[in-house]
């Protein structure tokens, strides 16, 4: 993926960083990988709103940018695992800060806290 050149621009470090984690899913993927190495299916289950195609695309972009490491095992069936790279790991405080900010401003952001989502009964289930 070709990256923009942000050198010699005011705010370039912020713009370049946001460009790396832009979009709806990259930050969420990085958040989930903070808990350790995961396979594609595990990530997909943690993010029910993402399509298989989009998850594949986002994982490739994060790998191309050096934020995650993809490890393929020579097994049948094939096994592929993803984990944070050292540079991806260095984003941990950034992702944690975004999470904390989101938790403080949930009502304003119109999103339910995780506990409410987990505890909410399914529609039509007694």
What residue ranges belong to the model's regions?
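N-terminal helix-turn-helix DNA-binding core of bacterial DNA-binding proteins
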Residues: 2, 8-54, 74-75, 81, ...
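Residues within the DNA-recognition helix of helix-turn-helix
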Residues: 58
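C-terminal regulatory/oligomerization modules of transcriptional regulators
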Residues: 1-9, 64, 69, 83-126
């Amino acid at each position: 993926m070709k990256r923009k050149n942000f050198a010699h621009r005011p705010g370039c470090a912020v713009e370049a960083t946001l460009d790396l984690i832009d979009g709806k899913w990259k930050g969420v993927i990085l958040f989930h990988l903070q808990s350790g190495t995961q396979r594609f299916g595990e990530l997909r289950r943690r993010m029910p709103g993402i399509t298989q195609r989009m998850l594949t695309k986002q994982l490739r972009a994060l790998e191309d940018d050096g934020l995650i490491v993809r490890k393929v095992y020579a097994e049948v069936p094939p096994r592929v695992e993803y984990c944070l790279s050292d540079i991806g790991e260095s984003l941990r405080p950034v992702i944690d800060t975004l999470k904390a900010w989101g938790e403080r401003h949930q009502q304003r952001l119109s999103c339910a806290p995780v506990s409410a989502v987990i505890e909410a009964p399914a529609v039509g289930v007694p």
